[in-house]
């Protein structure tokens, strides 16, 4: 006890809170300086000036992590969080959901009769232009399971890089995903548009649905079961119906799969994981009560399956970001060599070999498009470089060996569209000493030529109204984004860039018109997350132009009207 009392009475050692710049550089203790009042011993011996500066925590202003370091950090962060969330959710909800849903594995007669009664099946893999609703039966749990709230998110995780400085984040606000996130934080009106909350229930104890409601979770699949059919979630007949609906409703938006190759038996034998993810995507729209169960059966890696995981996620699915899944797919692409360029097709190639080769090539092209699209949306650097295959992809749709598919035309067209977007964005980001009017004139001219070329190719392929509208939507989105870069560059001038202002306005309005056409075709709800992001970006950009009306009114009104009309 006496020793303990002596230790309590012993005065604590007080160390200097600061060190001079010389000692900091040497990473040694600064001795004898008395917290900046005198010259330290090291500076005395070296006969140099003893300078004290305040600590600057974090990275130096203007310094950035390399893009490779950022991507690796995001991948590791997303993988760790996905694992931890999966384990905690399984332990918390598996028992309660099993008790409340004893017959999830049994087929639903209402679903079978409802789907087979509608007369629309994909004719030869082609997309029917003006499609009526499917008139599927309603399920009582489907609506509540996917209610949106202020805590859920359907947009890209564009702000997961906490290490970026405030100035970096301000510059990144020009990119669509960050622009939408900023507007959501800025005004509750935008939060209501982009992610509405449920109205509170009546009664004294009413609280927001997002704070009290937790959607039921499915139990994990039993050991040894690899896909939804073997797990008893759906039978083979239901799986075939879901595949038909996927090719009719979902594949026209992503153009990733070939109905001649990707049959139920082929996909199930080749990749249980891909089969599971396709069934999962179909269940999201046509059997939503089975959606969560299918998500838990993913146990093997496949590039196409990762792409589908980024296209159609649940409203409450925050397991990881789209960027992480695309990163996984890009790294797998390097390992398995999907981008191998085959200039001359072997003469002894069988029909199955041709379909499989085209499938590998299509997968890589779609992955390349998705990678460049994310770069445009978020401002991050792309992961896949251009190679021989990409440089020779402008006529890829013609080398199918048979009739040209409209979906393949879209894939080849989008590769060229990403070239135009990346080239223009790079010029503005690097600050090249070129007139913005010249850059814009070149970009808009290329987009006009692209539109003429690929509309002609689509006509030759026999595309429908949906395919032409789909091409137009993405062209208008690129036109809006590239012209917004020039408009932002001229924001400090007394008179804005009228050419860019006119292009931004018309592109945003026309984009929303195309989205309205999708609604009239009854296909809008089947679009991937990118469609939601692009339509939100166009609407928010029009509202931002409205906020800046007073500043733009300083320019000549007649000149503005002439440009817009």
Curated annotation (Swiss-Prot):
Disulfide bonds: none
GO cellular component, one term: nucleus
SUPFAM superfamilies (alphabetical): Zn2/Cys6 DNA-binding domain
Predominant subcellular localization, coarse grouping: nucleus
InterPro entries: prtT, Transcription_factor_dom_fun, Zn2-C6_fun-type_DNA-bd_sf, Zn2Cys6_DnaBD
One Pfam family this sequence matches: Fungal_trans
Transferase in keyword set: no
Domain of life per record: Eukaryota
Ranges annotated as biased composition (Basic and acidic residues): 90-111
Matches recorded under CDD domains: fungal_TF_MHR, GAL4
Composition-biased stretches (Polar residues): 203-215
DNA-binding region: 20-50
Assigned keywords, A-Z: DNA-binding, Metal-binding, Nucleus, Transcription, Transcription regulation, Zinc
GO molecular function, one term: DNA-binding transcription factor activity, RNA polymerase II-specific
UniProt keyword NADP, yes or no: no
GO biological process: DNA-templated transcription
Low complexity bias spans: 129-155
Region feature Disordered, mapped onto this chain: 82-170, 195-224
Location in or out of the cell: Nucleus
Stored PANTHER family: FINGER DOMAIN PROTEIN, PUTATIVE-RELATED, TRANSCRIPTION FACTOR DOMAIN-CONTAINING PROTEIN
Full protein name: Protein priB
Organism in which the protein naturally occurs: Lentinula edodes
């Amino acid at each position: 006890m006496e020793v303990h009392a002596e230790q309590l009475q012993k005065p604590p050692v007080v160390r200097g809170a600061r060190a001079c710049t010389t000692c900091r550089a040497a990473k040694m203790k600064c001795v004898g300086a008395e917290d900046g009042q005198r010259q330290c011993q090291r500076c005395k011996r070296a006969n140099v000036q003893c300078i004290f500066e305040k600590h600057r925590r974090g990275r130096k202003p203007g310094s950035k992590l390399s893009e490779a370091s950022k991507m690796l950090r995001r991948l590791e962060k997303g993988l760790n969080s996905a694992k931890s969330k999966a384990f905690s959710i399984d332990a918390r909800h598996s028992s309660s959901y099993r008790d409340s849903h004893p017959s999830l594995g049994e087929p639903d007669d209402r679903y079978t009769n409802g789907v087979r009664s509608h007369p629309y099946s994909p004719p030869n893999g082609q997309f029917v232009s003006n499609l009526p609703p499917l008139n599927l039966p309603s399920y009582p749990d489907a609506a509540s399971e996917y209610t949106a709230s202020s805590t859920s998110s359907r947009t890209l995780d564009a702000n997961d890089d906490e290490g970026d400085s405030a100035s970096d984040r301000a510059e990144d606000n020009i990119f669509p995903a960050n622009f939408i996130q900023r507007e959501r934080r800025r005004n509750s009106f935008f939060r209501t548009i982009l992610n509405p909350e449920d109205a509170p229930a009546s009664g004294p104890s009413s609280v927001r649905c997002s704070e009290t409601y937790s959607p039921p979770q499915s139990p994990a699949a039993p050991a040894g079961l690899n896909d939804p059919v073997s797990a008893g979630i759906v039978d083979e007949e239901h799986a075939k119906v879901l595949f038909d609906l996927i090719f009719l409703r979902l594949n026209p938006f992503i153009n990733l799969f070939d109905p001649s190759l990707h049959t139920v038996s082929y996909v199930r034998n080749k990749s249980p994981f891909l089969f599971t993810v396709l069934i999962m995507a179909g269940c999201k729209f046509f059997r939503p009560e089975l959606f969560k169960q299918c998500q838990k059966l993913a146990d093997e890696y496949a590039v196409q399956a990762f792409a589908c995981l980024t296209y159609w996620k649940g409203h409450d699915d925050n397991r990881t970001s789209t960027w992480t899944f695309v990163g996984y797919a890009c790294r797998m692409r390097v390992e398995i060599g999907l981008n191998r360029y085959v200039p001359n097709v072997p003469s002894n190639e069988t029909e199955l070999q041709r379909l499989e080769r085209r499938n590998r090539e299509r997968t890589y092209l779609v992955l390349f498009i998705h990678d460049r699209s994310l770069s445009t949306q978020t401002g991050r650097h792309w992961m896949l470089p251009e190679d021989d295959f990409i440089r020779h992809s402008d006529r890829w749709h013609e080398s199918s060996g048979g009739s040209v598919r409209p979906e393949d035309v879209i894939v080849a067209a989008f590769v060229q569209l990403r070239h135009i977007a990346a080239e223009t964005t790079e010029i503005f980001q690097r600050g090249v000493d070129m007139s913005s009017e010249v850059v814009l004139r070149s970009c808009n001219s290329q987009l006009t030529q692209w539109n003429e070329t690929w509309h002609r190719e689509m006509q030759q392929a026999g595309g429908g109204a949906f395919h032409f509208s789909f091409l137009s939507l993405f062209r208008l989105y690129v036109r809006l984004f590239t012209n917004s870069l020039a408009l932002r560059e001229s924001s400090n001038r007394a008179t804005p860039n009228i050419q860019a202002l006119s292009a931004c306005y018309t592109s945003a309005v026309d984009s929303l018109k195309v989205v309205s056409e999708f609604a009239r075709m009854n296909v809008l709800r089947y679009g991937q997350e990118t469609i939601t992001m692009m339509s939100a970006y166009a609407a928010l950009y029009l509202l931002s132009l409205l906020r800046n009306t007073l500043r733009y009114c300083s320019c000549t009104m007649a000149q503005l009207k002439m440009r817009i009309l």
